[in-house]
Regions:
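N-terminal glycine-/charge-rich "phosphate-binding" loop or analogous flexible N-terminal tail
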Residues: 1-38, 287
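Phosphate/diphosphate ligand-binding glycine-rich loop within oxidoreductases
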Residues: 34-110
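Short, conserved loop/helix-junction motifs that constitute active-site signature segments
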Residues: 47-55, 71-75, 201-206, 227-232, ...
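Oxidoreductase and adenylate-handling cofactor-binding alpha/beta cores
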Residues: 91-107, 145-146, 277-290
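Glycine-rich NAD(P)-binding loop of Rossmann-like domains
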Residues: 107-138, 165
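NAD(P)-binding Rossmann-fold cofactor-contacting core
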Residues: 145-162
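Rossmann-like adenosine-cofactor binding region
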Residues: 157-251
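Rossmann-like dinucleotide-binding domain for NAD(H)/NADP(H)
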Residues: 213-302
């Protein structure tokens, strides 16, 4: 039977998933070679644990983005993330935010008068998705009924099913002026950090909308506030912010035509169920000597 440690704290749902995979969860000891790490905010604690246990050969991380653990994943061992696990709820949230923006829901919610009669439609629109992972794969399925023409910008411009065209990062500036809706769904790396700034917003149509369900620091927050208040773009919806959590009174809360959700594209209820599936899948594969799902590439950073 496989022995695996869960640190820093094991949760009942994950213990059950491990048992269903035929694994035994044990306290960390010198014989344990597999670790399921369940803390989202303490990379130093994981680093110290790995220093103390050089026998560990595989670490399962609980999140899709591993930017906070960029130094740790360079260690000579196998790391797997939860990338792809949360694709359905996150893509669903991105679609909901997109429709809310285009149908001017923020304005409708707060108004106390009949107001202007205006809305955009997602049907037959041009959509640019920045990033080409599991969330994008799911988004392409959700967008298909709207007859959208979707351009995917990704590091590896291999074609994606459902996309009108798939292009490399170097084509971003060329394609931004064509998009009615821009959705950020890429990993946060040194290449994508603060990539969306005043220069990128200036390339977008003044009627275009931005949706960020990736990472907050992919967007320069001050530049986004300026772009919204000066009507450089028509609106934005963000499930992630920089800083995060966004402090009360921060200027972004009062920017024009902004929707902010508190990183709830995947809630704890959803995460527990979906990450339990990943635990089961990878523990079974590990025990059988088969390839694991969600392997992290230390060079790419995701």
């Amino acid at each position: 039977m496989i022995q695996v440690a869960m640190e820093p704290k094991a949760f009942p749902e994950y213990l059950e998933a491990a048992a269903e995979a035929g694994a035994q969860v044990v306290p960390m000891n010198s014989k344990v070679k597999a670790l399921i790490w369940l803390d989202y905010s303490q990379p130093q604690a994981l680093a110290e644990l790995l220093d103390q246990n050089p026998q560990i050969e595989w670490v399962q991380l609980p999140f899709a983005g591993v930017d906070a653990f960029a130094d740790i994943i360079k260690r000579p061992m196998l790391f797997t993330s939860a990338k792809g696990s949360y694709r359905e709820p996150v893509a669903e949230h991105a679609l909901a935010l997109s429709l809310a923006l285009m149908r001017v829901i923020p304005e409708r919610v707060v108004t106390k008068t009949w107001g202007r009669q205006f809305a955009d439609s997602l049907y037959d629109s041009r959509v640019l998705i920045f990033g080409g992972g599991g969330i994008t794969e799911e988004l392409l399925k959700l967008l298909a009924p709207f007859r959208t023409k979707v351009t995917v910008i990704r590091k590896n411009p291999a074609p994606m099913q459902g996309a009108w065209q798939t292009l490399g990062f170097e084509q971003l500036d060329t394609e931004l002026p064509n998009a009615d809706l821009v959705i950020l769904a890429a990993a946060l790396t040194s290449e994508t950090r603060y990539l969306f700034d005043a220069g990128k917003f200036a390339l977008m149509k003044p009627t275009a909308y931005l949706v960020n369900i990736a990472r907050g620091p992919m967007v320069n927050t001050s530049d986004l506030i300026g772009a919204l208040n000066q009507e450089v773009i028509a609106g934005a919806a963000v499930d992630v912010t920089d800083p995060e959590p966004l402090p009360d009174g921060h200027p972004l809360w009062n920017a024009k035509n902004i929707i902010i959700t508190p990183h709830t594209a995947d809630t704890r209820k959803q995460v527990v169920r979906l990450f339990s599936d990943r635990i089961r899948e990878n523990l079974k594969a590990y025990g059988q000597g088969k390839p694991l799902v969600g392997v992290v590439d230390p060079e790419l950073g995701y």
